From Swiss-Prot:
GO MF, one example: toxin activity
Family label: Belongs to the formicidae venom precursor-01 superfamily.
Entry keyword set: Disulfide bond, Secreted, Signal, Toxin
Protein name: U-myrmeciitoxin(01)-Mg6a
Keyword Hydrolase: no
Localization in the cell: Secreted
Signal peptide start-end: 1-20
Reported tissue expression: Expressed by the venom gland.
Propeptide: 21-33
Keyword Disulfide bond recorded: yes
GO annotation, cellular component aspect: extracellular region
Amino acid sequence: MNLKTFCFFLLGIFVTLTVTVIPIANADAEADTFRGPCLKIKGYKC
């Protein structure tokens, strides 16, 4: 495997991880945003 191929390989992994992980992280953040007020109001997880 030459350097150029290796760089494209790494870039592909990075893009795949970014595309996969960021929506999951965003979904978790949104869930926490909704969960937060519920915890304060009701005192338990929704």
